[in-house]
């Protein structure tokens, strides 16, 4: 896909990091603290402390797989690539069956990222966020991996239900050497295919970490699918689980 600079629109698919960002149960709260200010000290400096699998972040295989690749070992060509966006807003939240995406699986090219759009970013910071997103089920995940995708992403907190204790879907993806992008936003602004840039922090031997995800959209491709009216979602607490 070739995009001219004069026609490109950059869509920020990452949430802000701050002390109020939603967390899985049991995760220590973040601490973003300014310890020097321009008025008092002549310069500003801050301290950031947070768990690496919070906010918009990327899972490396080492997150769930003993001996799996760490984040700094993943080729950048797998993180700066193209994405195929599956609009799942007409599908019930939860695992997406293969038959729900079968009409588009043939569009997948080797090294694409598969992104699942639920419009769930509108629920960020509410109890509904932990129940109202879509992610590929086991059969769909295997089919996408067989097509050669480099990873998967979605506008929700995990590749598995938040109360999972087996992490089956994490293990399918990470066991195949793929990456997982969690807590994305603004996927509703993306067309069916676009360029994608995933820029994680370069931390040695990281099992995952914060990531800035930018979609590069050719204006000729349109502005994405307009938001559906909000689906009714049941509020729920967020029990612990892998993210």
Model-derived features with residue positions:
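Active-/binding-site microenvironments in catalytic and ligand-binding cores
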Residues: 1-243
């Amino acid at each position: 896909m070739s995009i001219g600079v004069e026609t490109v629109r950059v869509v920020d698919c990452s949430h802000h990091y701050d002390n109020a960002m939603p967390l899985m149960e049991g995760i220590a709260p973040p601490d973003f603290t300014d310890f020097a200010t321009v008025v008092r000290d002549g310069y500003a400096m801050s301290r950031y402390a947070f768990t690496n699998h919070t906010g918009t972040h990327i899972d490396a295989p080492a997150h769930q797989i003993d001996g799996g690749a760490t984040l700094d070992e993943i080729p950048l060509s797998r993180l700066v690539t193209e994405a195929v966006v599956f609009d799942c807003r007409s599908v019930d939240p939860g695992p997406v069956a293969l038959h729900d995406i079968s009409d588009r699986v043939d569009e997948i090219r080797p090294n694409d990222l598969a992104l699942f759009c639920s419009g769930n970013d509108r629920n960020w910071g509410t109890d509904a966020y932990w129940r109202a997103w879509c992610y590929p089920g086991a059969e769909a995940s295997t089919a996408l991996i067989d097509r050669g995708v480099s990873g998967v992403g979605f506008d929700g907190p995990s590749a598995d239900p938040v109360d999972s204790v087996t992490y089956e879907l994490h293990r399918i993806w990470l066991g195949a050497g793929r990456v997982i992008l969690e807590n994305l936003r603004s996927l509703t602004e993306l067309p069916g295919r676009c360029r994608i840039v995933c820029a994680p922090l370069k931390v040695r031997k990281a099992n995952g970490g914060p990531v800035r995800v930018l979609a590069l959209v050719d204006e000729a491709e349109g502005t994405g699918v307009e938001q559906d009216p909000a689906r009714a979602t049941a509020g729920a607490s967020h029990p612990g689980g892998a993210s």
